Amino acid sequence: FIAQEAPANPEYNYIAIDIKNEMLVLAKRKLEAAYAEQQLPLDNVRVMIDNIMYLRECFAETDRLDRIYINFCNPWPRGKHKKRRLTHPRQLVQYRMLLDGEIWFKTDDDELFEESLEYFPEAGFRITTMTRDLHSEPTLRYFETEHEHMFDEMGKKIKFLIAEPDPSVPEESLRELLQYSEKYSERKR
């Protein structure tokens, strides 16, 4: 995904984050090949190994993100593990503190998607675009990921949404969720 998105938009900067080093090594190789093929300098994307739970620690308070892509993340289906989801309200509020734009979320997992439809409003987002069959929506511009291609060939429908911060959500409720999120993060470190 990043090897398609970043060279197509050289005016934007990208950060690819994953907790697995193997994924980032593969992404880096694909980035280098894509930029070499297009004879572009690889100067608008960085790869970083880290736990996304600590994303806010990677940026200054004044740094802002225009868009966050969450593509085919671990669905953590077991009840006690759901709080590890990248779309759990505790995590979404972390993103919200850095975000001036949108979150684009894609998955093949029905349960994760349906529960995420509830998570986003809980974390102070409003869903502006949503489909349970992305490939039947020709008006949506996106780059297909390898997982997406694989799942599509298996006949699985790709679910997709775009969410943005909801300005009508009181800051106090976001602060409470953020405090809970930070308290949990400190215990896990």
Give residue ranges: language-model regions:
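Conserved SAM/SAH-binding beta-strand->alpha-helix loop
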Residues: 20
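A short SAM/SAH-binding and catalytic strip from SAM-dependent methyltransferases
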Residues: 53, 59-86
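S-adenosyl-L-methionine
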Residues: 28-67
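Conserved short alpha-helix immediately C-terminal to the canonical SAM/SAH-binding motif I
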Residues: 23, 112
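A short glycine-rich, Lys/Arg-flanked "PGG" loop and its adjoining helix->strand segment in the class I
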Residues: 85-104
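Conserved SAM-binding loop of SAM-dependent methyltransferases across substrates and taxa
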Residues: 1-11
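Conserved Class I S-adenosyl-L-methionine
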Residues: 90-93, 114-135
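SAM/dcSAM-binding transferase cores
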Residues: 128-189
